[in-house]
Design a protein with these regions (language model features):
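Juxtacatalytic substrate-recognition/specificity segment
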Residues: 1-109, 191-198
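Short, solvent-exposed mixed-charge patches
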Residues: 1-2, 236-238
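Acidic/His/Gly-enriched intrinsically disordered linker/tail segments
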Residues: 60, 65-73, 80-87, 103-237
Length: 238
Protein backbone atom coordinates (compact mmCIF):
# COMPACT_ATOMS: atom_id res chain seq x y z
CA UNK A 1 0.00 0.00 0.00
CA UNK A 2 1.05 3.60 -0.56
CA UNK A 3 1.36 6.07 2.30
CA UNK A 4 0.75 9.77 2.88
CA UNK A 5 1.66 11.56 6.10
CA UNK A 6 0.10 14.63 7.66
CA UNK A 7 0.71 16.18 11.07
CA UNK A 8 -1.31 13.63 13.07
CA UNK A 9 -1.97 10.83 10.55
CA UNK A 10 -0.24 8.27 8.38
CA UNK A 11 -2.65 7.21 5.62
CA UNK A 12 -2.38 3.85 3.83
CA UNK A 13 -4.19 3.23 0.53
CA UNK A 14 -3.96 1.31 -2.71
CA UNK A 15 -2.52 2.60 -5.97
CA UNK A 16 -5.09 3.81 -8.48
CA UNK A 17 -7.89 4.03 -5.90
CA UNK A 18 -10.31 6.83 -5.10
CA UNK A 19 -8.40 7.30 -1.86
CA UNK A 20 -5.16 7.94 -3.75
CA UNK A 21 -6.94 10.43 -6.00
CA UNK A 22 -8.44 12.33 -3.05
CA UNK A 23 -5.73 11.83 -0.43
CA UNK A 24 -4.83 15.50 0.08
CA UNK A 25 -8.49 16.41 0.63
CA UNK A 26 -8.99 13.41 2.94
CA UNK A 27 -5.94 14.35 5.00
CA UNK A 28 -7.06 17.97 5.31
CA UNK A 29 -10.54 16.93 6.42
CA UNK A 30 -9.28 14.44 9.01
CA UNK A 31 -6.83 16.96 10.42
CA UNK A 32 -9.70 19.44 10.82
CA UNK A 33 -11.85 16.80 12.51
CA UNK A 34 -8.93 15.85 14.77
CA UNK A 35 -8.32 19.44 15.87
CA UNK A 36 -11.99 19.96 16.70
CA UNK A 37 -12.29 16.71 18.68
CA UNK A 38 -9.15 17.51 20.66
CA UNK A 39 -10.32 21.07 21.35
CA UNK A 40 -13.69 19.89 22.66
CA UNK A 41 -12.32 17.03 24.79
CA UNK A 42 -9.23 18.87 25.99
CA UNK A 43 -6.85 16.06 25.09
CA UNK A 44 -4.44 15.31 22.26
CA UNK A 45 -3.00 11.85 21.55
CA UNK A 46 0.79 11.61 21.68
CA UNK A 47 0.89 9.29 18.67
CA UNK A 48 0.21 9.48 14.94
CA UNK A 49 -2.98 7.71 13.84
CA UNK A 50 -2.49 4.95 11.27
CA UNK A 51 -5.43 5.33 8.85
CA UNK A 52 -6.14 2.51 6.37
CA UNK A 53 -8.34 3.63 3.47
CA UNK A 54 -9.80 0.54 1.82
CA UNK A 55 -11.63 0.12 -1.47
CA UNK A 56 -14.37 -2.15 -0.07
CA UNK A 57 -15.71 -3.67 3.17
CA UNK A 58 -14.07 -6.94 2.16
CA UNK A 59 -10.70 -5.22 1.87
CA UNK A 60 -11.15 -3.76 5.36
CA UNK A 61 -11.52 -7.27 6.76
CA UNK A 62 -8.63 -8.60 4.69
CA UNK A 63 -6.17 -5.86 5.67
CA UNK A 64 -7.20 -5.97 9.33
CA UNK A 65 -6.79 -9.73 9.25
CA UNK A 66 -10.11 -11.23 10.34
CA UNK A 67 -11.70 -11.24 6.84
CA UNK A 68 -14.93 -9.87 8.34
CA UNK A 69 -16.37 -7.23 5.94
CA UNK A 70 -16.88 -3.86 7.59
CA UNK A 71 -17.28 -0.24 6.47
CA UNK A 72 -15.10 1.15 9.21
CA UNK A 73 -13.88 0.78 12.78
CA UNK A 74 -11.23 1.98 15.21
CA UNK A 75 -8.60 -0.55 16.27
CA UNK A 76 -7.46 0.94 19.56
CA UNK A 77 -5.12 2.52 20.38
CA UNK A 78 -3.93 4.03 17.10
CA UNK A 79 -5.47 2.48 13.98
CA UNK A 80 -8.54 3.24 11.88
CA UNK A 81 -9.87 1.16 8.97
CA UNK A 82 -12.41 2.76 6.63
CA UNK A 83 -13.97 2.20 3.21
CA UNK A 84 -13.33 4.96 0.72
CA UNK A 85 -14.55 4.65 -2.87
CA UNK A 86 -16.73 6.63 -5.26
CA UNK A 87 -19.94 5.41 -3.61
CA UNK A 88 -18.96 5.13 0.07
CA UNK A 89 -16.69 7.45 2.07
CA UNK A 90 -16.50 6.36 5.70
CA UNK A 91 -14.28 9.21 6.78
CA UNK A 92 -14.96 12.17 9.05
CA UNK A 93 -15.37 12.44 12.80
CA UNK A 94 -16.67 9.10 14.04
CA UNK A 95 -13.74 6.69 14.32
CA UNK A 96 -11.31 9.51 15.10
CA UNK A 97 -13.53 10.50 18.04
CA UNK A 98 -13.15 6.98 19.41
CA UNK A 99 -9.36 7.07 19.11
CA UNK A 100 -9.04 10.49 20.74
CA UNK A 101 -11.63 9.93 23.49
CA UNK A 102 -10.12 6.61 24.51
CA UNK A 103 -7.00 8.49 25.60
CA UNK A 104 -9.25 9.79 28.39
CA UNK A 105 -11.01 6.51 29.18
CA UNK A 106 -13.13 3.77 27.68
CA UNK A 107 -16.43 3.72 29.63
CA UNK A 108 -18.19 0.38 30.00
CA UNK A 109 -21.30 1.53 28.13
CA UNK A 110 -21.22 1.34 24.33
CA UNK A 111 -24.10 3.84 24.19
CA UNK A 112 -21.89 6.44 25.85
CA UNK A 113 -18.90 5.66 23.63
CA UNK A 114 -20.94 5.69 20.42
CA UNK A 115 -22.98 8.63 21.63
CA UNK A 116 -19.84 10.74 21.88
CA UNK A 117 -18.77 9.73 18.37
CA UNK A 118 -22.27 10.57 17.10
CA UNK A 119 -22.14 13.90 18.94
CA UNK A 120 -19.23 14.83 16.69
CA UNK A 121 -20.87 13.31 13.59
CA UNK A 122 -24.05 15.36 14.22
CA UNK A 123 -25.99 13.47 11.54
CA UNK A 124 -27.19 10.01 10.48
CA UNK A 125 -27.91 9.63 6.76
CA UNK A 126 -27.45 13.42 6.45
CA UNK A 127 -30.25 14.14 8.95
CA UNK A 128 -29.57 15.65 12.38
CA UNK A 129 -29.50 13.36 15.41
CA UNK A 130 -32.05 15.57 17.16
CA UNK A 131 -34.46 15.30 14.22
CA UNK A 132 -34.20 11.51 14.28
CA UNK A 133 -34.78 11.42 18.03
CA UNK A 134 -37.84 13.66 17.83
CA UNK A 135 -39.20 11.55 14.98
CA UNK A 136 -38.71 8.36 16.98
CA UNK A 137 -40.53 9.90 19.95
CA UNK A 138 -43.39 11.00 17.70
CA UNK A 139 -43.74 7.60 16.00
CA UNK A 140 -43.28 5.36 19.04
CA UNK A 141 -39.84 4.13 18.01
CA UNK A 142 -37.89 5.94 20.71
CA UNK A 143 -35.74 3.87 23.07
CA UNK A 144 -35.04 5.37 26.52
CA UNK A 145 -31.39 6.12 27.11
CA UNK A 146 -31.36 4.27 30.43
CA UNK A 147 -32.22 1.08 28.51
CA UNK A 148 -29.55 1.74 25.89
CA UNK A 149 -26.88 1.80 28.61
CA UNK A 150 -27.10 -2.00 28.69
CA UNK A 151 -24.69 -3.21 26.01
CA UNK A 152 -26.62 -6.34 25.08
CA UNK A 153 -29.76 -4.28 24.56
CA UNK A 154 -27.90 -1.49 22.75
CA UNK A 155 -26.39 -3.85 20.20
CA UNK A 156 -29.72 -5.66 19.74
CA UNK A 157 -31.25 -2.44 18.36
CA UNK A 158 -30.70 -1.20 14.82
CA UNK A 159 -27.86 1.32 14.73
CA UNK A 160 -30.06 3.75 12.78
CA UNK A 161 -32.23 4.04 15.89
CA UNK A 162 -29.77 3.62 18.77
CA UNK A 163 -26.90 5.75 17.44
CA UNK A 164 -28.77 9.02 16.70
CA UNK A 165 -30.56 8.83 20.06
CA UNK A 166 -27.24 8.34 21.86
CA UNK A 167 -25.72 11.21 19.88
CA UNK A 168 -28.57 13.60 20.62
CA UNK A 169 -28.47 12.64 24.31
CA UNK A 170 -24.73 13.37 24.43
CA UNK A 171 -25.30 16.74 22.78
CA UNK A 172 -27.96 17.56 25.38
CA UNK A 173 -25.75 16.46 28.29
CA UNK A 174 -22.87 18.64 27.12
CA UNK A 175 -25.03 21.68 26.35
CA UNK A 176 -27.03 21.40 29.60
CA UNK A 177 -24.25 20.52 32.04
CA UNK A 178 -21.03 21.51 30.30
CA UNK A 179 -18.07 19.66 28.86
CA UNK A 180 -16.18 19.42 32.17
CA UNK A 181 -19.06 17.53 33.79
CA UNK A 182 -19.24 15.27 30.75
CA UNK A 183 -15.50 14.60 30.90
CA UNK A 184 -15.82 13.75 34.60
CA UNK A 185 -18.54 11.21 33.78
CA UNK A 186 -16.64 9.81 30.79
CA UNK A 187 -13.54 9.18 32.88
CA UNK A 188 -15.40 6.66 35.05
CA UNK A 189 -16.10 3.02 34.21
CA UNK A 190 -19.62 2.60 35.61
CA UNK A 191 -21.87 5.02 33.77
CA UNK A 192 -24.95 4.79 36.06
CA UNK A 193 -22.78 5.50 39.11
CA UNK A 194 -20.99 8.29 37.27
CA UNK A 195 -24.28 9.92 36.27
CA UNK A 196 -25.51 9.88 39.85
CA UNK A 197 -22.22 11.28 41.11
CA UNK A 198 -21.66 13.95 38.45
CA UNK A 199 -25.22 14.97 37.54
CA UNK A 200 -27.05 14.03 40.73
CA UNK A 201 -29.63 12.08 38.73
CA UNK A 202 -30.23 8.48 37.75
CA UNK A 203 -30.10 7.46 34.07
CA UNK A 204 -33.92 7.26 34.03
CA UNK A 205 -34.20 10.79 35.45
CA UNK A 206 -31.74 12.13 32.89
CA UNK A 207 -33.66 10.36 30.13
CA UNK A 208 -36.92 11.98 31.27
CA UNK A 209 -35.33 15.43 31.19
CA UNK A 210 -33.83 14.69 27.77
CA UNK A 211 -37.19 13.55 26.37
CA UNK A 212 -38.82 16.76 27.63
CA UNK A 213 -36.12 18.77 25.86
CA UNK A 214 -36.52 16.88 22.57
CA UNK A 215 -40.28 17.45 22.60
CA UNK A 216 -39.67 21.21 22.46
CA UNK A 217 -38.71 20.88 18.78
CA UNK A 218 -40.71 20.21 15.64
CA UNK A 219 -39.43 18.61 12.44
CA UNK A 220 -40.47 19.63 8.93
CA UNK A 221 -42.91 17.22 7.31
CA UNK A 222 -40.68 16.74 4.27
CA UNK A 223 -37.80 15.70 6.54
CA UNK A 224 -40.07 13.25 8.38
CA UNK A 225 -41.17 11.75 5.06
CA UNK A 226 -37.52 11.36 4.09
CA UNK A 227 -36.76 9.63 7.40
CA UNK A 228 -39.65 7.22 6.95
CA UNK A 229 -38.48 6.42 3.42
CA UNK A 230 -34.92 5.79 4.62
CA UNK A 231 -36.11 3.43 7.34
CA UNK A 232 -38.14 1.46 4.79
CA UNK A 233 -35.23 1.44 2.33
CA UNK A 234 -32.88 0.00 4.95
CA UNK A 235 -35.55 -2.27 6.46
CA UNK A 236 -35.13 -0.76 9.92
CA UNK A 237 -37.28 -1.94 12.79
CA UNK A 238 -37.00 -0.23 16.17
Amino acid sequence: MRTFESEHYRFHYGAGTAAERDITEIAAMQESCFRHICAVLGTTPDFRIEYFLCDSPEEVGHIYGDDDPCNGFADIPDKIYAVYNDAVQCVGFHEDAHVVSYTLNRPESAAIREGLAMYFDRKWWSIENLDWTGFYLKTGRYIPVDRLLDDDFFFSRHCAVAYPIAGAFTDWLISAYGIEAYRAMYRQKSVPQAMAQVYGKSPAELNAAFEAYVRLFRTDGAVEARMEALLRQHEVEA
